[in-house]
Amino acid sequence: QEYYEVGSNPLLGTKVYDAAVLWKENSYIPESLMCLSFQFQKHLSLGRGGMILTDDKFAAKDLRMMAHDGREPFVPWREQDIKCIGYHYYMTPETADLGIEKLPEAIKREPRQWVIEDWPDLTKMEIFR
């Protein structure tokens, strides 16, 4: 079986890394956008949600606005002139609390070793043919 090397290549020549299954200490790639997943099969299983890690404060501000419907925090929505697309993707406080509760055990537990066969072959899906 061929192992999937998480974070080995950015997506389509960008600085975006698919780190959805990554669970490794000190693995952040500087100057990148690393996308994590907390979907039910992932190491820190919260049922849904994720996060994007970055050390770029401008990207962090933009991503935060996009996660909150394109709105700026702490400004009443009626007073805003929305300048970017938004997705309503913020994590609920209840899910974040569950993550904090599950984190210590996830840190102790050995992560799953994903193999390439764990993903479907996109070339066989009608939409990609």
Language model features: what each stretch is:
Residues 1-37:
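Conserved PLP phosphate-binding loop immediately N-terminal to the Schiff-base lysine helix
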Residues 23-25, 30-129:
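Active-site region of PLP-dependent enzymes
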